[in-house]
Amino acid sequence: MPSPIPVERFLPRDLSPSIDLRPCSSPLELSHRKLPGGLPACSGRPRLLPPRLAWCSIDWEQVLLLEPLGSGGFGSVYRATYRGETVALKKVKRSTKNSLASRQSFWAELNAARLRHPHVVRVVAASASCPGDPGCPGTIIMEYTGTGTLHQRIYGRSPPLGAEICMRYARHVADGLRFLHRDGVVHLDLKPANVLLAPGDLCKIGDFGCSQRLREGDEAAGGEPCCTQLRHVGGTYTHRAPELLKGEPVTAKADIYSFAITLWQMVSRELPYTGDRQCVLYAVVAYDLRPEMGPLFSHTEEGRAARTIVQSCWAARPQERPNAEQLLERLEQECAMCTGGPPSCSPESNAPPPLGTGL
């Protein structure tokens, strides 16, 4: 489908033409290169974190590298121990083509610092340097959740996700989004590959390398809170909200759109789009192109419920999408229907909350 306008103006020049389904903070391509048990001493004066993040500075004497887990995007991840606890250590890559993007990715990861939630990967410690690599933009130590992602669960050899599991996983992700948005953080790269599966079959949102913080005060003024950085150029194009493709300000509703694509993937077990990237992007913006709703979204009551949720969350206008609070309440209702138990959301109303109203 030819594009009558230059779609390139919506795209960062260094965006890969292929679908990037790989996260930075979860296991990817295994490397067979041996690692030393420890890290070399820092050379020169180490770069320090700002005072507000001094609490999480890495004590390098307590770091012991165990094995590489993988690499992708802006970082390489290792299994390690820190103060006797098994952790994931992410070393941000030094990019010769875009060093600014590498630094921005590191500082964006720290948007999750101090945050504690069952469905958000916890940042344990961080450093603006790395021993033996003075050019490294930074190092982040995170909780170790294991080696699985939601992407691997959807597209691997496991049986398809049943309705109950789909809704439970979706509820975990929505709960994590609600927490992040309440704290003023927008993830901006939500997709199955960035949702880690932890022990207890818990979903945890990870890889905050594209995240941004909302500006304070906008909500009180009656508008939707926007990010401090008005334009967004990162993330995965298949999950990027139409308003971001058009260069409009970033709001938390962009994560809701990405959630819709993610839930669609959980149900369908298919990739969102095929074909030329620029044609897809133009069609998403100009013609409201969305992934096709197959029979799985219409043959059962659960499928029809998922269809309603997905369609409300990927509405073209951000104002028509639910916020994370409304989304979680609706998913709680659906989980209760799947399990036959009472809903665990607020008992103020037994009816599903209206979707697409408010922030």
UniProtKB/Swiss-Prot annotation:
Which GO biological process entries does UniProt record here? Answer: MAPK cascade; protein autophosphorylation; signal transduction
Q: Where are the transmembrane segments?
A: none
Ranges for domain Protein kinase come to 63-336
Task: Write out the catalytic residues in the record.
Answer: 189
List where in the cell it is found: Cytoplasm
One GO cellular component this record assigns the protein to is: cytoplasm
Q: Name one Pfam family in it.
A: Pkinase
Q: What is its EC number?
A: 2.7.11.1
Q: Which gene encodes it?
A: mos
Indicate the principal place this protein occupies in or around the cell: cytoplasm
Question: What's this protein's function?
Answer: Serine/threonine kinase involved in the regulation of MAPK signaling.
Q: Which GO terms describe its molecular function?
A: ATP binding; MAP kinase kinase kinase activity; protein serine kinase activity; protein serine/threonine kinase activity
Binding of ATP occurs at 69-77, 90
Family under the similarity heading: Belongs to the protein kinase superfamily. Ser/Thr protein kinase family.
Can you state which reaction this protein catalyses? L-seryl-[protein] + ATP = O-phospho-L-seryl-[protein] + ADP + H(+); L-threonyl-[protein] + ATP = O-phospho-L-threonyl-[protein] + ADP + H(+)
Q: What is this protein called?
A: Serine/threonine-protein kinase mos
